[in-house]
Design a protein with these regions (language model features):
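Conserved lysine of the Walker
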Residues: 19
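NTP-dependent small-molecule kinase module
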Residues: 1-5, 25, 29, 100, ...
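P-loop (Walker A) phosphate-binding loop of NTP-binding proteins
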Residues: 14
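Short glycine-rich anion-binding loops that position phosphate/pyrophosphate groups of nucleotides
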Residues: 83-86, 107-109, 155
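ATP-dependent small-molecule kinase phosphotransfer cores
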Residues: 37-85, 89-93
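A glycine- and Lys/Arg-enriched "phosphate-lid" helix/loop adjacent to the NTP-binding pocket
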Residues: 97-140
Length: 170
């Protein structure tokens, strides 16, 4: 894969994997803009993801996420997606057409330690699903859409950033 100048870098992965944190660091390191789709959703909804999930349900949150992503028109940006972006083929094809999709792979026990409450975090999943259930359901989707997979489970932010930079065809 050859990375064209001005292409976006799209980060996908489970909630708690570090998409937003690493996205900011990556954008700064390569001189790109940073876009966090979770923040765009919150701005459009006028409430937190957790509140939106509570008031409208997980399917409405997934739909809004897909609409926000399909409305993106950016270049030279690092885009941190919500963990459920991969449920929308249309949204993911829109993202893939604009750049390189990087799956930030993280072990369940690491994610579990970072996420206090799935509901408060705004994780778009049916009631009763555990984080393990959500991860098992999403891994095949992340792997399907990823151009690159970077394992970051036992790395701090700087190490994870170095791993991403090493694997990106910049």
């Amino acid at each position: 894969m050859v990375f064209a100048q001005h292409e976006n870098i799209i980060l996908i992965g489970m909630p708690g994997a570090g998409k937003s944190t690493l996205g900011v660091l990556l954008a700064k390191a390569i001189g790109y803009d940073f876009i966090d789709t979770d923040l765009l959703i919150q701005r459009q909804a006028g409430m937190t993801l957790g509140d939106y999930l509570h008031n409208h349900g997980y399917q409405a949150l997934r739909q809004m996420e897909a609409e926000v992503i399909q409305g993106l028109n950016s270049a030279s940006s690092v885009i941190a997606t919500g963990g459920s972006a991969v449920y929308s083929d249309e949204a993911m094809h829109h993202l893939k057409a604009s750049g390189c999709v990087v799956y930030l792979q993280c072990l369940l026990n690491v994610l579990d330690g970072r996420i206090a409450s799935m509901n408060d975090r705004g994780i778009a999943a049916p009631s009763g699903q555990t984080l393990a259930d959500v991860q098992a359901e999403r891994i095949p989707l992340y792997e399907h859409f990823a151009d690159l997979t970077v394992e970051i489970s036992h790395q701090d932010s700087e190490q994870a950033l170095a791993s991403i930079l090493q694997q990106l065809p910049l």
